[in-house]
Amino acid sequence: FLYAVSYTCFVELMPCVFFDLMPFMRIQGFGKCMGISFVDSTMIPVCHNMRRKFNKVFDELTKNGKGTMGWCPGLKLHLLCNEIGDVLMFCLTPANEDDRNPRVWKVFTKVLYGKVFADKGYIKQEFFENLFNQGIHLVHGLSRT
């Protein structure tokens, strides 16, 4: 690996090449669904919360969303993987979008069948029934209500 970078450099370089990697992933990088899939979402902050009023680069694309580190403007990455860890599909939305967004799942259901394992953010009876009618069984954690 003559041109390999360290992990620290990789973390610094990743935001610079993230949007260049998306078209590559759409063309080359997706795996095949084998009947068992996993889905989750995570926040991609575009700037620190204190600088949100001055950030104009992603002004039209980003919304304020709450992640594990608190509120910040950013995007939400919805990621669908198969059981061996291959990315099946991904979708970027504003950070305040719900995990059960119908537009995201319209994209996901094109490559999906079988069982999908998700966290508690995907619990909703109507959403479960909609996927079940398409032949997709949603498996999620129990809600503590």
Stretches found by the model and what they are:
Residues 1-145:
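Short alpha-helical elements
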